[in-house]
Swiss-Prot record:
This is Putative pre-16S rRNA nuclease. Belongs to the YqgF nuclease family. Keywords: Cytoplasm, Hydrolase, Nuclease, Ribosome biogenesis. GO terms for cellular component: cytosol. One of its GO terms (molecular function) is nuclease activity. SUPFAM superfamilies: Ribonuclease H-like (SSF53098). It is found in: Cytoplasm. The keyword Hydrolase applies. InterPro entries: RNaseH-like_sf, YqgF, YqgF/RNaseH-like_dom, YqgF/RNaseH-like_dom_sf. CDD domains: YqgF. It comes from Pseudomonas fluorescens.
Length: 145
């Protein structure tokens, strides 16, 4: 199956950022932020996104430590990726998401956003777009014709 459209997920225990990316353009953009309860999203919202966007695969960010070793959250993010695969029969990929939230906060400031708390105006969707863009950039050679 040819990959054309991807959804990217920035997994978190309270919020999960979502982005969409197209292989043909090599571009990713933010979609939305889903609320989560202890890492569990509202699966009806996830299903609505899957039905609307009809992705060929999903990319889930892995929150690796700065030295490249898996963090405690990596296991939970991988479990989330496997659940997406099991529920929607979509292939999944994981991608290093180190510093994407930090970069997303900087991006929010550049756009004129707040400097304080990100609870009311989360950056998770921006982080999802950054990690998905990173995956697209890292795998561009796979899609060249």
């Amino acid at each position: 199956m040819a990959l054309r459209l991807l959804l990217g997920f920035d997994y978190g225990t309270k919020q999960i950022g979502v982005a969409v990316g197209q292989v043909i353009t090599g571009q990713a953009r933010e979609l939305c932020t889903l609320k989560a309860q202890n890492g569990v999203p509202d699966w009806n919202q996830v299903e609505a996104l899957i039905k609307e966007w009809k992705p060929d695969a999903v990319v889930v960010g892995l929150p690796l430590n700065m030295d490249g070793t898996p963090s405690d959250m990596c296991l939970r993010a991988e479990k989330f990726a496997r659940r997406l695969n099991g529920r929607y029969n979509l292939p999944f990929y994981t991608h290093d998401e180190r510093l994407t939230t930090f970069e997303a906060k900087g991006e929010r400031l550049v756009r004129g956003g707040q400097k304080g708390s990100y609870r009311d105006n989360p950056v998770d969707a921006i982080a999802a777009a950054l990690l998905l863009q990173g995956w697209l950039d890292a795998n561009a050679a796979l899609f060249e014709t």
